Structures are given as C-alpha cells and as structure tokens.
From Swiss-Prot:
The keyword RNA-binding does not apply. Catalyzes the specific phosphorylation of 1,6-anhydro-N-acetylmuramic acid (anhMurNAc) with the simultaneous cleavage of the 1,6-anhydro ring, generating MurNAc-6-P. Is required for the utilization of anhMurNAc either imported from the medium or derived from its own cell wall murein, and thus plays a role in cell wall recycling. GO terms for biological process: 1,6-anhydro-N-acetyl-beta-muramic acid catabolic process; amino sugar metabolic process; peptidoglycan turnover. Pfam families: AnmK (PF03702). It catalyses: 1,6-anhydro-N-acetyl-beta-muramate + ATP + H2O = N-acetyl-D-muramate 6-phosphate + ADP + H(+). Its EC number is 2.7.1.170. ATP binds at residues 9-16. This is Anhydro-N-acetylmuramic acid kinase. Pathway: Amino-sugar metabolism; 1,6-anhydro-N-acetylmuramate degradation; Cell wall biogenesis; peptidoglycan recycling. Signal peptide: none annotated. One of its GO terms (molecular function) is ATP binding. NCBIfam families: PRK09585.3-1. The lineage of its organism: Bacteria, Pseudomonadati, Pseudomonadota, Acidithiobacillia, Acidithiobacillales.
C-alpha cells in the first residue's frame, strides 16, 4: 500500500508531497518528494488568514487551497507513481488548544481533492487529538520512532515554522518517547526578513544575514523570558503566539541593524531548543535536524554552540530522507494508521487523555478497491518488534 502525504506548514511557503510505501518498514519506504511553492497571491492570502477573517473569505480560501492541493497531488502521482490514498494535513489557520474550548483548524477542501483525483483522502488529524484532550501537536513523533529509533537514545528536531523536538528511547528501553513544541523555528526569522526587506524577501537564505550580525545577549534573555518557554510539556504553539505581530513589536524598539536583529532571532530559536531539551528530556548524544531550518547554516551552528554535549546532524544527509519530505511522509504514515483502525497513544506527546484513531476518511472513487486491499494488509508496525505507541482497536 502506497500513501501520498500532503503537507503545508506554518511558514506557508508551499506544499510538500511525498510518497511512502508501507510494504517497506521505516525509512526504506520513502519513494520520493515533490515540492510546489504557493503562488505569491495565495501565500499572501494564507498569511492574512492568521488575522480576522470572515466566514465567506475563509470558505473561499478553503476551496482555493483544495484546488492547489489537488493539482499538487495529480502532479506528484505523475512524477512519483500511483498511490492508494492521500493523507492531507491541510493549512493551519488557527491553533489554540488551550482555549475554552480549545481548538485547532486546518483547511484545504479534502472533498475537492477526492473528487479531482478519485482517491480516498484521510484528513483532519489534529482535531481528533484535541477532542481527546491533547494539544493537537506535535503529531509527527510516532513516525520519528518508526523511522529513527536506534540502539541509543536520539533526539529528532523539526525546524519548520515552529520547532518541535522528539526524544526517542534506545531500543529495549521501556521509557516512552517524549515530544513537544519548543517554540519558534523559522517563523520569527522569516517574518523579520519580510519586514526588514519591505516584502522583497521571505527568508534568510543559508542564514547569511544572521551570520553578518551580532547577537544582542541582553535582548535575547528578555525574549527568552516569554511565558511559553517556561511552560512544561505537553505544549504546542503557533503563529498566534510567535508571528509577525510579535516581530513587529520587537523591531519597533530595536536600535541595532537588521543583521543584528536576525542574529538575535536566530539565537532565540537555537537557545530555546537547547534549554527545552535540557529541561524536559533525558538528552542524547546526537540530534537529527529536519525542516527548512536545517538548511540555515547560521542556525545549525547556533544549535551546535548551544548544545555542546550533543552532536547536531543534518537529518536529511544522515538518513537519506530529504528534510522537506519528512512531515509529508509522517502524515502518509498517520493516514495508513487511520485506515487500518490503529489507535495512537500520545499521552506523553500531546497530552491526549486516551488513545485515539487520528483522522477522518473521505472515500474516493477507489474506496471499494482500497477496502479490499486493507482487508489483506498485514499490520504495519515499527521494524520487527511491537510498536509501543500503537494499540489495535
């Protein structure tokens, strides 16, 4: 069984489409990735949706994103080969799991994708976790364990818009995995570049701007006093907490150069990760780094400087899975678990109060054939042993 994962994150830079072959365990199931950048007008609309947005505008954006995802899915199949289902993360518009009531919202018209492709779509993963009392994020850590668990404990860091870290116990270690959001990944740096360039640039390519500046350690400590960094896991965050309004406020009182501002924001991401790892995990000798932040040389160096006891490795080069593929692959795997009726126990990850089957299934034209295939599917577990985070229904 082959799944296509579609992922667009809080950076809102585009869609990653990756194929996972579930017949092969772990990283060996990776079959390729295709990335489609959002058109500038759509990206602007997505970013604007983080502010007040009317029902009609939200509904129209939902359909426009669905049309974009459908085009990406068709092109991914053309490039990477046929698949049996699509797993859609969608575009996060709001993430406030600690509200009254808490909620998270991802949009992207899954029905449009199913109709356009004829394929069954699994979607809406995060709201199931929130319904079970969880944060709705991070959801990728079980896939980290499926792919990257080793004899010794290991850390896996994803540097997308937000930064989230997973601590994996060594094989045979009875301790459960731990995972949580550390705070901002690329989101504040990207916002600062956009602000300082008057919209002419959207990211600090290779960390060159930050590398040309000096970190303001006084401001850094002020920013690290943010309440989120003091909060114990399980915890998750989003643009509502770390986004353009925060960067605009900090920039308005900044007296140094733009390069120094970028250098200090880069240090903020690195130091917040390092402090979170020391405070809330048992630590590990190595950490695999994925996501767009892994391509930022200034950020990778800042991480290594802040975590001298841990070897910081580029996850894509170390594992053979490109950084832009990891989250899309994870959702393809999560989609397979939903189709197979597998419960995920995420108590030590999101704080969910009991195991749940994550996701909703929207049958496509291939649904009857997929049902037959699912009835013949062996259980998909991690490597040779039982996967501790899975429980059969």
């Amino acid at each position: 069984m082959r799944g296509l994962g579609l992922m667009s994150g809080t950076s809102a830079d585009g869609v990653d489409a990756a194929v996972l072959d579930l017949a092969v365990a772990g990283c060996g199931g990776y079959r390729g990735v295709f990335t489609h950048a959002f058109e500038p007008a759509l990206r602007t609309e997505v970013l604007a949706a983080n502010g007040p947005l009317g029902v009609e505008a939200m509904a129209q954006l939902d359909r426009r994103l669905g049309a974009c995802y459908a085009r990406v899915a068709r092109e991914a199949v053309d490039r990477l080969g046929p698949v049996d289902f699509i797993a859609l993360h969608g575009q996060t518009i709001r993430h406030q799991p600690r509200g009254e009531p808490g909620f998270t919202l991802q949009i992207g018209a899954a029905a449009d994708i199913a109709v356009a492709t004829g394929l069954t779509v699994v979607h809406d993963f995060r709201r199931t976790d929130v319904a079970a009392g969880g944060e709705g994020a991070p959801l990728v850590p079980p896939f980290h364990q499926y792919c990257f668990q080793d004899e010794q404990p290991r850390l896996v860091l994803n540097l997308g818009g937000m930064a989230n870290v997973t601590w994996l116990p060594g094989t045979g270690d009875p301790r459960p995995l731990l995972a949580f959001d550390c705070g901002p990944g690329n989101v504040l740096m990207d916002a600062a570049v956009e602000l300082c360039s008057a919209g002419q640039a959207t990211c600090d390519v290779d960390g060159r701007l930050a590398a040309a500046g000096q970190c303001d350690v006084v401001r850094l400590e002020e920013w690290l006093d943010h309440v989120f960094f003091r909060q114990a896991p399980p915890k998750s965050t989003g643009r509502e907490t770390f986004g353009m309004p925060l960067v605009t406020r900090w920039w308005s009182s900044w007296r140094g150069s733009a390069a120094d501002f970028l250098a200090t924001l880069t240090a903020l991401t690195a130091e917040s990760v390092a402090r979170a790892v020391r405070a809330w995990t048992p630590g590990a000798a190595e950490m695999l780094v994925f996501g767009g932040g892994a391509e930022n040389q200034a950020l990778m160096q800042a991480l290594q400087d802040a975590m001298k006891e841990t070897r910081v490795l580029h996850g894509g080069r170390h594992s053979g899975i490109p950084g832009q593929a990891l989250e899309a692959l994870a959702f393809a795997w999560l989609g397979s678990q939903c189709l197979l009726g597998k419960r995920l126990d995420l108590e030590r990850v999101t704080g969910a109060q009991h195991p749940m089957i994550l996701g909703n299934i929207l049958p496509g034209d291939n649904w009857p054939d997929l049902l037959v295939q699912l009835s013949q599917q062996p259980e998909i577990t991690a490597r040779e042993g039982p996967y501790r985070a899975l429980r059969s229904v």
